[in-house]
């Protein structure tokens, strides 16, 4: 299997305030998906047992891929979608990190249904409830 350029621990962090999505490989070869403003710091937390419970006792852990994605909302949406993908998809992402932009863009597009025009109510339904529409 070809090694990714991300198999070595990265030495740079994303710009301050920017969120990243990352993949960590466990000793058993499983891939864990997470988000952080500092993936390297987060990896160290995972390695020390102070990170996600899912990774405790699963080391050694290796950060195999990371991508700066912007704000926390975008990071959460992308994390959710990436966690739904197969391991084969994630392995391909590790091997071909340049394809991330193509794959992730549709995940950030929020599709909202078109608004329907308000329905006009019949005239008799406009009167207040409890009113008999008589002048008194």
Swiss-Prot record:
Task: Please state every residue range assigned to the domain named GIY-YIG.
Answer: 17-92
Q: Return the SUPFAM superfamilies for the record.
A: GIY-YIG endonuclease
Q: Which domain of life is it from?
A: Bacteria
Instruction: Name the protein family.
Output: Belongs to the UPF0213 family.
Q: What is this protein called?
A: UPF0213 protein ASA_0550
- All disulfide bonds of the chain are none
Q: Which InterPro entries match?
A: GIY-YIG_endonuc, GIY-YIG_endonuc_sf, UPF0213_domain, UPF0213_GIY-YIG_endonuc
């Amino acid at each position: 299997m070809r090694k990714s350029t991300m198999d070595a621990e990265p030495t740079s962090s994303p710009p301050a305030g920017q969120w990243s999505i990352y993949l960590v490989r466990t000793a058993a070869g499983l891939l864990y998906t997470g988000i952080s403003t500092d993936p390297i710091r987060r990896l160290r937390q995972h390695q020390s047992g102070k990170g996600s419970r899912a990774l405790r006792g699963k080391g050694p852990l290796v950060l195999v891929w990371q991508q700066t994605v912007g704000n926390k909302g975008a990071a959460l949406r992308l994390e959710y979608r990436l966690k739904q993908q197969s391991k084969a998809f994630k392995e391909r992402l590790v091997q071909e990190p340049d394809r991330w932009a193509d794959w992730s863009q549709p995940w950030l597009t929020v599709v909202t249904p078109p608004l329907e025009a308000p329905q006009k109510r019949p005239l008799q339904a406009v009167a207040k409830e409890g009113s008999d529409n008589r002048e008194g």
